[in-house]
Amino acid sequence: MSNYKYLFIFLVIAFSFEPAFGVSSFSADEKENIQIYEKSSRAVVNISNIAVNYDFFYRAMPAETGSGTGFIIDKSGIIVTNYHVVENASKLVVTLADNSQWPGKLVGADPNNDLAIVRIKAPADSYDILEFSHSNNIVVGQKVLALGNPFGLRQTLTTGIISALGRTIAAKNGRKIEGIIQTDAAINPGNSGGPLLDSEGKVIGINTAIIGSAGSVGIGFAVPSNTALRILPDLLKYGYVRRPWLGIEPIPTVYLRRIGIDVPDGLLIARVVKGASADQAGLRGASRTVKVGRYQVPWGGDIITHINKIPVTTMEDLAQQIETRKAGEEITIHYIRNDRVLSVTVELVLRPRS
């Protein structure tokens, strides 16, 4: 009988220590994942995009056209997400981690970088916030974590590494987004707008599901945090990004060479907008058109070859050199006019809102 008594005591002691043994069985990496999830998940929200259509009798017929993810960065209820998550919304509904729902107001949007800002008026104690880290410090191979709502499955965590840096993808409006982060962390439809976190739980990117919309194929993409940090002040203050421009209509000379015209690499200026940066700097557009085969080609304009000594041969090259700067900044443009290589300093001015 005493043997049964000792066995019972042993089993009680063993089971009483089981939770402790279970906790200690987590690896250091697993513990880090758990800590980051617990620290970050209350800052991640689901955003439902509601469109309102009307029937024959003009009765409103709201319908959810899609959903995505966002994350809160400020106790005033500021949410960062993708532009394509909120595009064309008649109504936005934001669901917090505690399942409470709040109307969202679109504060600002930048289709060119697929980013948008939404605000909610919810009690500050009903959510947490995330902090940004500078994406210029990240390296290929480092661990990353993605939080979001893939396929409507809320509060989902996936992990991976940074697979590559400096990728270029197309935004929904066709513009190229430069400097994209590539990761093997699973990013699926519904993850759009969610945070890509480093091992400290700080945001280094904004996940996007633009590419591979049919589902994850082991390649995910994120807009770098430095892009968001650069444009957020404008989105919050003006609702859009105030970008500088040259005020030219350029033609990549590669197209001219395809029809048999011998011209150097660069951008031929077809037209200069009066009063814009290029006009003020004295750059010239085409003075006439010439017929080449069945084509009418603008001719006689300056050919831009470099900006700040960096070759410029495509529209994407030009956008990268201009739109990442601020109005008032100066750039040096190298160009060819009448077979002479010249340069000029140009002060950038704001692109007109229209």
Language-model features: locations:
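Bacterial N-terminal signal peptides that target proteins for export
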Residues: 1-8
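Bacterial N-terminal signal peptides
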Residues: 8-19
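Serine-dependent protease modules
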Residues: 22-265, 271-274, 315, 319, ...
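Conserved PDZ fold ligand-binding element
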Residues: 79-80, 280-315
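Nucleotide-binding motor/catalytic cores of P-loop/tubulin-like NTPases across gene-expression machines
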Residues: 273-276, 305
